Amino acid sequence: MLGSEALATQLRAERQQLKLMVSLEMLAYTDDEQNYPHKAMRAVYRDTGDFIALVANTGAGLMLPGLAQRMGRHVTTKVLPVPSAGRAIPDVRLSDHSPFWDQGYNALMVTDTSFMRNPHYHQMSDTVDSLDLDFFSRVVDGLDAALGAL
């Protein structure tokens, strides 16, 4: 995350405005099971790992309903708005969006939940044949619809 941290810091120092930073973090794995950083999340979200998650800080959270609605036309979409730059749920900070949260920018992580779902994550077995390319195609179509409307 060194590059995203450097960029977010530079943008803040230059007082640059940014509508939304989007981090695409693992987008193509589905599974019959899904894990969560907190067990209570299972009651709100699905037991099956066949959805894409939109994880956003408070400012970007205002965009979540529209983004989720547009993406949801293509792929099952779940939202997770996180206050306080996600500090209460450290696992949601493990990607390039978090330095933007720290600098006060609106940022969104789009994810299939990576290691919470995919046993191949950062393993030699993480190959194209382990991915669900139909799901990935629907994610891309959903991103096109959602982000194109911003």
Walk through the language-model features, giving the residues of each.
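Solvent-exposed, polar/charged alpha-helical surfaces in well-ordered, non-transmembrane soluble domains
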Residues: 5, 9, 65, 69, ...
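Sec-exported extracytoplasmic/periplasmic mature domains
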Residues: 9-16, 68-76, 101-105, 144-149
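Short catalytic/ligand-gating loop segments at beta-alpha or beta-beta junctions
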Residues: 74-93
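An extended, acidic, His-containing surface patch that forms the Zn2+-binding/catalytic region
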Residues: 91, 98-100
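His/Asp/Glu-rich mid-to-C-terminal helical/loop segments that flank catalytic regions of hydrolases
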Residues: 116-150
